[in-house]
Amino acid sequence: MLLHTFEAEGKSVCLFPGRQPDAPVLYLNTFPGEGERVLRALRETGCADFSLVAVSNLDWNCDMAPWDAPPAFARSGPFTGGAQEYLGLLTQKIIPLAEGQLASAPRWRGIAGYS
């Protein structure tokens, strides 16, 4: 499995190119090391070809929260509303860097990895 890795503002990014040059690309917000396991599991099901970009080293309570909010659980931290900044990082840096390493532009993009 061909793999390209890079960092963008502290986020770790792993790119697993699809077999077809214009395969769709899926951006997965995940934990370190999970991208390859997810890709392998999906390929075992016989799903259509796609490229996977696994983004990790996330601050879940900041990067995935659109606004400040109190902790959801007694022993967890508050949500700090950094989703807009993360979305900017994703669209302005991660996507261009990742797709610049692909053979051609993807047919479409998707995003996954958070409830």
Regions found by a protein language model. Name each.
Residues M1-S115:
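Non-catalytic cap/lid and distal C-terminal segments of serine-dependent acyl enzymes
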